[in-house]
């Protein structure tokens, strides 16, 4: 799958100029989310504390080092529609992941396969916001096809996992709950839930511990 490498996912995120889009299209009405429990006491705001480090210790070898050394923030651009610094970072990550430029196209250094994917949108949606994203990806040599389909096709393709990328809304609870399992557990990989297709023993273990703790609290 095109998004199986974390460096590719990070590079594509760097190409998404939220600051420009928010200013030019939405009158700065939106704010960026950097935690699943945004604006609650459970939001991730700092480095893991002592209790969290105890939970994470058995899984440390399976986690990116950044979990312990960096406070997560989404990429921030200059908001001018062309953030050269972010695109250079994205280019570096793609090269490290084995995706190189050949002419104007990003291809796999080993197989020659082009780096391309499809963005699936509901037929009724406004695609204005994704066109600048598509243009930024083109600067990196990545082709993103935008395809609109009706709601029944969206549902069918979700059930069969026949999609590369689509917009999703997570209506998260303001506190940890069993909803975490539905949204992120590998147990729900063959359903319309867990839309990103996350399959991680680490995430499964953490979710199970959270649910067990909720049970003890009640």
Give the location of each predicted region:
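Extracytoplasmic/periplasmic ligand-capture domains
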Residues: 1-36, 40-216
């Amino acid at each position: 799958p095109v998004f199986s490498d974390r460096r590719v996912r990070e590079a594509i995120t760097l190409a998404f100029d939220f600051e420009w889009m928010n200013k030019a299209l939405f009158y700065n009405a939106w704010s960026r989310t950097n935690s699943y429990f945004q604006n609650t006491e459970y939001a991730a705001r700092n480095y893991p504390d002592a209790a969290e480090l105890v939970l994470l210790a058995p899984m440390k070898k399976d986690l990116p080092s950044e979990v312990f050394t960096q406070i997560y923030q989404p990429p921030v651009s200059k908001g001018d529609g062309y953030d050269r610094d972010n695109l250079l970072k994205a280019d570096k990550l793609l090269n490290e992941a084995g995706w190189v430029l050949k002419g104007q196209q990003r291809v796999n250094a080993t197989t020659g396969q082009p780096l391309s994917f499809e963005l699936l949108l509901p037929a009724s949606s406004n695609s204005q916001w994704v066109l600048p994203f598509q243009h930024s990806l083109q600067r990196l040599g990545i082709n993103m096809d935008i395809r609109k389909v009706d709601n029944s096709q969206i549902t069918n393709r979700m059930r069969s996992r026949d999609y590369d990328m689509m917009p999703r809304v997570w209506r998260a609870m303001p506190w940890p709950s069993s909803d975490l399992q539905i949204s992120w557990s590998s147990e729900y990989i063959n359903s319309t839930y867990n839309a990103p297709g996350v399959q991680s023993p680490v995430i499964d273990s953490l979710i199970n511990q959270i649910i067990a703790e909720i049970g003890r609290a009640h």
